[in-house]
UniProtKB/Swiss-Prot annotation:
Pfam annotation, one family: PRC
Domain topic, free-text comment: The PRC barrel domain binds ribosomal protein uS19.
Composition skew (Pro residues), residue ranges: 181-190
Function: An accessory protein needed during the final step in the assembly of 30S ribosomal subunit, possibly for assembly of the head region. Essential for efficient processing of 16S rRNA. May be needed both before and after RbfA during the maturation of 16S rRNA. It has affinity for free ribosomal 30S subunits but not for 70S ribosomes.
Family from the record: Belongs to the RimM family.
Organism: Rhizobium rhizogenes (strain K84 / ATCC BAA-868)
UniProt-annotated location(s): Cytoplasm
GO molecular function, one term: ribosome binding
Keyword check for rRNA processing: yes
Protein name in the entry: Ribosome maturation factor RimM
Length: 190
């Protein structure tokens, strides 16, 4: 059993497919059929999975793992998340303006005045576009669009992302940038 130091979620296993031990999986890679190209996949409980075969299907990939030889074994994997070590991702293949979503986690979101809006705690794709989750001390998590309008610059080395708080939906107007929390409705004094 191997514990990963810096795990990166690569796929989630779904239902069994057929009788030979294949499973349906949602891959979180740019090329879903490349899931096995990063080495062995690991579950958080320490199991290791080797991809033997992989093919595309509608919205998922069909995967056969070594040692999973029948439907019962495949059904037991339903819902399992599979990870690799961050170091297994090929940094040398990235362009200067490319990065892995996992590298965004922990970056501080600030505007052009230096106002902090929280730290990126996750990147999600619910189908209508990617979202960044920001968490701040004493604040509830918020989701902002991961778009060119909302995220103006990504500085991995500096540990920051520059955001436009209006485009991100964090404020309603530039007047909201006073640095003070908004007043509750009905309790304003002029």
């Amino acid at each position: 059993m191997t514990k990963l130091e810096n795990p990166v979620l690569m796929a989630t296993i779904g239902a069994a497919q057929g009788l030979r031990g294949e499973v349906r999986a949602r891959a979180f890679t740019s090329d879903p059929t490349a899931l096995g190209d990063y080495g062995h996949l690991h579950s958080m409980d320490g199991r290791i999975f080797e991809v033997l075969e992989i093919r595309e299907a509608k919205n998922v990939v069909i995967v056969r793992f070594r040692g999973v030889n029948n439907r019962d074994a495949a059904e037991a994997l339903n819902g399992l998340e599979l990870y690799i070590e961050r170091d297994n991702l090929p940094d040398d293949e990235l362009e200067d303006d490319e990065f892995f979503y996992t590298d965004l986690e922990g970056l501080e979101a600030v505007d052009d005045k230096g106002t902090a809006y929280g730290t990126v705690s996750g990147v999600y794709d619910f189908g209508a576009g990617d979202l960044l989750e920001l968490k701040g001390p004493g604040k509830r998590p918020v989701l902002i669009p991961f778009s060119e309008a909302a995220v103006l610059e990504i500085d991995l080395e500096g540990g920051k992302i520059l955001i436009d708080p209006m485009a991100a939906g964090l404020i309603d107007s530039p007047d909201d940038l006073t640095g003070k929390p908004p007043k509750p409705p009905g309790k304003t004094k002029e």
